[in-house]
Curated annotation (Swiss-Prot):
Similarity annotation: Belongs to the class I-like SAM-binding methyltransferase superfamily. rRNA adenine N(6)-methyltransferase family. RsmA subfamily.
EC numbers: 2.1.1.182
Catalytic activity: adenosine(1518)/adenosine(1519) in 16S rRNA + 4 S-adenosyl-L-methionine = N(6)-dimethyladenosine(1518)/N(6)-dimethyladenosine(1519) in 16S rRNA + 4 S-adenosyl-L-homocysteine + 4 H(+)
InterPro entries the UniProt entry points to: KsgA/Erm, rRNA_Ade_diMease-like_C, rRNA_Ade_Mease_Trfase_CS, rRNA_Ade_methylase_Trfase_N, rRNA_adenine_dimethylase, SAM-dependent_MTases_sf
Gene for this chain: rsmA
Subcellular compartments: Cytoplasm
Highest taxon of the lineage: Bacteria
Stated name of the protein: Ribosomal RNA small subunit methyltransferase A
Length: 284
């Protein structure tokens, strides 16, 4: 069977069988319930079915159906865009309710970040073994005061421990992309900060994105711009939390971001409460 890879779906198929086996081995899928994004021609999928308890795969390209025929009842393939799916509904329909899932995928380069954020915000996914553009992988692992350190670095490291499995040269794919790739394994933290409420996690993500809004600007300027607050109020917050007014987001560690984000939203709530009280007093 012939299939012409579609550029609009970012289709680059890994040719190296030994590397495919290594990816599945490192993913440690024995007896687990697994999600695969983009099974493609099924090379990786076939190996997964030999290890997994159940496999739910999402394929956006229906022309790949002839390649995705397996002699097992352990797999279900949904021909749809993973990003548009109600994952909770899909998971409840196929797996047991409140199950823990492992995810595996060769991510399309052009939507890697979008998929990562969906994975991050899906609590059922406890680990993910991912092939991605090397540049994006370096950002995920980046540390403070490095050029690759950004909001994605902080947010991903907040939720997951990141292990680098292997770099993959571009010639190992068909068609050959212009850039190299890397395989990473993301394992959800079991530490205290990851037991925060959903609202606390959303606040953290909101704060980190705001802090890196314009990387070359100071934290003070970014917070003022995003939250529409006068700098005098933010300087007061900085003084209360012993922050330098010229500090930039790229200088702040993950643990510091955790502490600052909590204090920031407490500060905002107090500010709003104070403004409301002043308004009421003026009306009396």
């Amino acid at each position: 069977m012939q299939h012409q890879p579609k550029k609009k779906y970012g289709q680059n198929f890994l040719k190296d069988v030994n590397l495919l086996k290594k990816i599945v081995s490192k993913a440690n899928l024995k007896g687990k319930n697994v999600i695969e994004i983009g099974p493609g021609k099924g090379s990786l999928t076939n190996l997964i079915t030999k290890e997994a308890n159940l496999l739910l795969a999402y394929e956006i390209d229906p022309t790949l159906k002839p390649f995705l025929v397996f002699d097992t009842t352990k797999i279900k393939i949904i021909y749809d865009d993973f990003l548009k799916r109600d994952l909770v509904k899909d998971f409840d329909n196929y797996f047991s309710i409140n199950c823990q899932l492992s995810l595996i995928s060769n991510l399309p380069y052009y939507i890697t970040t979008t998929i990562l954020f969906k994975i991050i915000q899906t609590p059922q996914i406890v680990d993910a073994t991912l092939m991605m553009q090397k540049e994006v992988g370096m950002r995920l692992m980046a540390q403070p005061n490095s050029k690759n350190y950004n909001a994605l670095s902080v947010i991903t490291q907040y939720f997951f421990n990141i292990e680098k499995i292997q770099e993959v040269k571009s010639h190992m794919f068909f068609p050959q992309p212009k850039v190299d790739s890397v395989v990473l394994k993301l394992s959800k933290h079991k530490s205290d900060f990851n037991t925060f409420s959903t609202s606390s996690q959303k606040n953290f993500i909101t704060f980190v994105k705001a802090a890196f809004k314009q990387k070359r600007k100071t934290l003070l300027n970014n917070l003022s711009s995003v939250f529409l607050l006068p700098k005098t109020e933010i300087i007061l917050f900085f003084e209360q939390n012993k922050l330098l007014t010229k500090i930039r987001a790229e200088e702040i560690t993950l643990k510091e971001f955790q502490k600052i984000s909590i204090q920031w939203f407490l500060f905002q709530n107090k500010t709003k409460e104070s403004q409301l009280n002043n308004y009421i007093l003026k009306k009396v």
